[in-house]
Swiss-Prot record:
One of its GO terms (biological process) is phosphatidylethanolamine biosynthetic process. GO terms for molecular function: phosphatidylserine decarboxylase activity. This is Phosphatidylserine decarboxylase proenzyme. The active site is at D101 (charge relay system), H158 (charge relay system), S262 (charge relay system), S262 (schiff-base intermediate with substrate). Heterodimer of a large membrane-associated beta subunit and a small pyruvoyl-containing alpha subunit. GO terms for cellular component: plasma membrane.
Length: 288
């Protein structure tokens, strides 16, 4: 694995844009998005889809269904499947894979229990995992990767390595944007936003895959539980899985998806051999 650390300072414009987000009714906006992207009226959903493809320059040649009008809703288009050959896995069976298309925001060692967010900002593993100190201790001095999914990216999340689900935690919170300007300005952003933390046991020890919500994320889904958000509660909801009902998901297989875009954070309890990252822009299935 490689180390990638972006210490770009926040600008005055970053702070201004972030300040405008605080008073917004985050969950109300997300509920409206949740409704709008599921409208099946042909002219409406086709207008949204075609405008989105044009504005964000979406490459439909990778999609399993290339015809934009074939999708029953905007959400079906947004969470579209890709052709199997679009994301080939590396030949090395031990390589740890990127769980998603996107941009690496940060990647590197967990310093004791602290995860680097941006210059001047950090949060702890316990804060990210809903305050569970015992669970957080499993990732002490481990490794993390934070990947930002932009609107144009593929929005299904896949397994970095094979794992058996131990626990899923739905943690309530705000729904700030997770665009780079908020990462640079909002303290403890990923530990404040609503999120779903999925804890897996792997051959290399525990692994967490945390799906972080954002202001336009209509919902988060996993392949074993279906749609998890909305609604948003006021307390963390824990789902524990025993050996007889715990799904095992193979490396590279889908484990969840964002219905609109956001951020994925992965945690491991050991530090891999050092490597060199060639680009912060990655695709699902690439070695990280």
């Amino acid at each position: 694995m490689s180390v990638y650390r972006d210490e770009s300072p926040a600008t005055g414009l970053d702070h201004l844009k972030a300040a405008l987000l605080y008073p917004l009714p985050h969950h109300a906006i997300s509920r409206m998005v949740h409704w709008a992207v599921r409208v099946e009226t042909p002219w409406f959903k086709n207008l949204l889809i075609k405008a989105f493809i044009r504005v964000f320059k979406v490459d439909m040649s990778e999609a399993l269904e290339e015809d934009p009008t074939a999708y029953p809703t905007f959400n079906a288009f947004f969470t579209r499947a890709l052709k199997p050959e679009a994301r080939p896995l590396p030949d090395d069976p031990d390589a740890i894979l990127s769980p998603a298309d996107g941009t690496i925001s940060q990647m590197g060692p967990i310093e004791r229990d602290t995860i680097f967010q941006a210059k001047g900002h950090s949060f702890t593993t316990a804060e990210l995992l809903g305050g569970d100190e015992a669970l957080a201790e499993e990732f002490r001095d481990g490794w993390f990767a934070t990947i930002y999914l932009s609107p144009r990216d593929y929005h299904r999340v896949h397994m970095p390595m094979t794992g058996t689900l131990r626990q899923m935690i739905h943690i309530p919170g705000r729904l700030f944007s997770v665009a780079p300007f908020t990462v640079r300005t909002v303290p403890k952003l990923f530990a404040r936003n609503e999120r779903v933390a999925c804890i897996f046991d792997t051959d290399r020890g525990p692994m967490a895959v945390v799906l972080v919500g954002a202001i336009n994320v209509g919902s988060i889904e996993t392949v074993w539980a279906g749609e998890i958000t909305p609604p948003a509660g006021i307390r963390a909801q824990y789902s524990n899985y025993e050996a007889d009902n715990a799904p095992t998901i193979a490396r590279g297989h889908e484990m969840g998806r964002f219905n609109m875009g956001s951020t994925v954070i992965t945690l491991q309890n050991s530090r891999p051999a050092p490597g060199k990252i060639m680009s912060a822009h990655i695709k699902q299935g690439m070695t990280i």
